């Protein structure tokens, strides 16, 4: 028999009754019922119930062990009997009557319980992450991540992509987030950087003559944490394709996402094909370029309805309406609570009216609406008895943010929100440029390296604020999974694009010398995308925080509490790396 086990703890069934077995695992739980000791033994594969009878050596040994100690047991599989079957366990029809016990590793008193999801704070969980990962939910999340990545690889190969590795030590990048830098021992005063993304290398692979590239790429950014973003390190499905237009990129990625979310979504419906929504339309209808399409409500721009209005709350402002059917009969509390939510999102209040059975409008602002206002709103919003309308007024961006959040919250409260579904969409036609509100200067809106729609002709003849870019995002349930673009592979177009944003040719040639040099040796048209693996798993696991799907994440302050990183270096290491440390002076 094997030194540690003949079977796993998730393997035994009623067909194994009478078999002598050896199991190893963690002491998950212990119960003493009428002098008989019942132990739940857990390993990676499941749980098997052990039974030890009083007066036996096995009973004495198991009775002394602390929870989460590792043990090896020898025993015989017996039937639990019809009255004692546990239908929640695959092994629930049997138990193992223990004859021999060997302690493999004793556990100290636990900082928190493993077999229940108690309210232990995240910092403690991350400090003892090796214990936290023993919990069923966390263990399941990490195994889901493993399966998702394995499936991505096989699906990408089936779609004709080739997996290739790109460097981890590279040059610093002048754009994007802050780099993590690595000092060079051999080249004093010089530094490598960990890649924020393999962006330049994957484009160089296309210029090198490869056609369809992918990798599960580690990326490093020195940025602050959010619920959907882990500080430090994250992983993305990095993709690049040659001789493609936008829809050529969409097709394989849409197929991949549909199949992936159907495979691991536990029956949640995946809407396909994914709608293509222009950026401007998304901002107007949903108040966000990351719309949650499970909310079956849309915003309507009614700014023109109140042009010249004497109603000061709306006059001269951008006004957005949110019509909500079947809520007119809701109590005043419904409207007040939605107003409180709007205030929590930054609004000063939330104006509203409702349509009665007689078709007349009532509510806090009904008296300020003229007959012309009411007629136009009724027509524009298709109002009918039972409807309510919520209004937001102010600057475009402010109203979009607030009313976009109100749209989703109202849908949830009013029963117009789809559950158990993955609603994807593509956001397309991003503006190439925007005007800096403080300086009034033209700057890039999103990705400066994307191809402008219309190419050089657009750059030379259109108002910069009217130029659209071949940029796109893929969004699922309000979570941005990735940005992508058709790349600007023509040096003259790139130089012109940067010139419009205020960069002279000398600066661009210096900062992006490597890419521009490669572009001048016959670069193919190419484009790509990089969906975030962590965010994909977060959605599939239905977790609110990305750190719940990563085995060993940093905390929100970019610290590894388990390993003690970041650490200080001793003076000899600093000298070897030609470094001195200057800590900020306390204020």
UniProtKB/Swiss-Prot annotation:
GO BP field: aspartyl-tRNA aminoacylation
Reactions performed catalytically: tRNA(Asp) + L-aspartate + ATP = L-aspartyl-tRNA(Asp) + AMP + diphosphate
Coiled coil (residue ranges): none
Enzyme Commission code(s) on record: 6.1.1.12
One example GO MF annotation: nucleic acid binding
Binding-site list for L-aspartate: 175, 221, 446, 487
Main location: cytoplasm
Subcellular localization, as worded in the UniProt entry: Cytoplasm
Keywords: Aminoacyl-tRNA synthetase, ATP-binding, Cytoplasm, Ligase, Nucleotide-binding, Protein biosynthesis
UniProt cross-references to HAMAP family, sorted A to Z: Asp_tRNA_synth_type1
Protein function: Catalyzes the attachment of L-aspartate to tRNA(Asp) in a two-step reaction: L-aspartate is first activated by ATP to form Asp-AMP and then transferred to the acceptor end of tRNA(Asp).
Protein name as annotated: Aspartate--tRNA ligase
Source organism of the structure: Streptomyces coelicolor (strain ATCC BAA-471 / A3(2) / M145)
Taxonomic lineage from the root: Bacteria, Bacillati, Actinomycetota, Actinomycetes, Kitasatosporales
Name of encoding gene: aspS
